[in-house]
Amino acid sequence: MDWDLNAAGAWDLAELEQDHAAAAPSSGGHAANAAAAGTGTESRPPAPGAAGAPAECSVDLKLGGMGECEPGAARREREAAAGAAKRPRPAGPGGQQQQQCPSCAVDGCRADLGKCRDYHRRHKVCEAHSKTPVVVVAGREMRFCQQCSRFHLLAEFDADKRSCRKRLDGHNRRRRKPQPDTMASASFIASQQGTRFSPFAHPRLEASWPPGVMKTEESPYHITHQIPLGSSSSSRQQHFVALGAATPAYAKEGRRFPFLQEGEISFATGVVLEPPAAAPACQPLLRTGAPSESSGAGGSKMFSDQGLARVLDSDCALSLLSAPANSSGIDVSRMVRPTEHVPMAQQPVVPGLQFGSASWFPRPQASTGGSFVPFCPAAVEGEQQLNAVLGPNDSEVSMNYGGMFHVGGGSGGGEGSSDGGTSSSMPFSWQ
């Protein structure tokens, strides 16, 4: 398709001529109106068809803003008039206008703070003197603190932190504030005396007590001696003899603990062992014998090695679960003579048994004995095969032993207690 450039140019020229012709009468009409206003007459606008051409035929883009442009001279005059209308600043005390930019507070400093940052202008210090170690302000040597933005004396200043000490103390106090929970726990732990905590509360020591009455780590009571079950009888005999030789003097004399009431258990002499011999599988572990040379109390109960060897070497489990269903409690209290206190060995005969004070069973003062039912293998079922172990009265028991305790109110004999009286057995697990 070919374009006719001449025809397009002719159309543009014709359109421009029409616009120019329409603008000429309009400007003439405005001039006539102005003249009429000066003379007091009113003029009317010309008719639309007076020019002979349509007035609305022009096509233009009304972008706006072009008519608001004014010459530079007029704009300058308007800005000058607005500046004159502003109120002037009040004069200072001396009648002169106040200085716009403050000077540095350091003596002899004439630095222009107008070129510095607003921080330095507000605090009246130049950038150089804000970091100087020593400056003279009002005749005194001071230093500018960058933390509180003030001048301080050298005595109040910390050179390492580049800050005043007063502000540093408050800052450290706020950051290192001690916690109340931590202080309470620390004071509680510090108040506890001793090397370790014990699950049982011990009584306080009294001045009237004999020395060594409390168990300590150096005491032979504190040492745990373990005897292997597979060891021979001779090695076990030597082991128990060594324990008897290590018995302290206050235990050999049969002294009681002062904090125990009358009628309670007291410690007795050391262990006296005898060589093993042929005996039933459930021979008693306690017997009544003559006191040894190292013993201080006569007629005390001693442990025998005969029944111990058979029990340790036995294949039967030392548990109540292996006991036969038809076995009953055995009363063995009639052949032991009555004593006020039932002495007891210092170390457990069978490993794992505890004769400690935490496991003792207290009894009233009227009770002087008890009945004890040891566990026997399944081959022994009768009551007649077990001799006496403890006191003649079977009312209560006051000794802790791994096995079974017999508590009843019978007449005191073995047959009488099983036939006439009502008895009950309390099982205790081996410890």
Curated annotation (Swiss-Prot):
GO terms for molecular function: DNA binding; zinc ion binding. It comes from the Eukaryota. Residues 408-419 have a biased composition (Gly residues). It holds the Pfam family SBP. Coiled coil: none annotated. GO terms for cellular component: nucleus. Zn(2+) 2 binds at residues 145, 148, 152, 164. A zinc finger (SBP-type) spans 101-178. Residues 18-55, 68-102, 408-431 are annotated as: Disordered. Zn(2+) 1 binds at residues 104, 109, 126, 129. Strongly expressed in immature ears and weakly in husks. Found in the inflorescence meristem of the developing ear, in the spikelet pair primordia, the glume primordia, the cupule forming region and other floral organs. Not detected in other tissues. Residues 21-41 have a biased composition (Low complexity). SUPFAM superfamilies: SBT domain. Keywords: Metal-binding, Zinc, Zinc-finger. SBP transcriptional regulator probably involved in the domestication of maize. Acts as a transcriptional repressor binding to a 5'-GTAC-3' motif. May repress the growth of lateral branches in length and numbers. The N-terminal domain is necessary for dimerization. A single Lys to Asn substitution at position 6 is the probable cause of the transition from the hardened fruitcase surrounding the kernels in teosinte to the cob that bears naked grains in maize. This substitution is not affecting the DNA binding site specificity, but increases the stability of the homodimers. Monomer and homodimer. This is Teosinte glume architecture 1. It comes from Zea mays (Maize). The gene is TGA1.
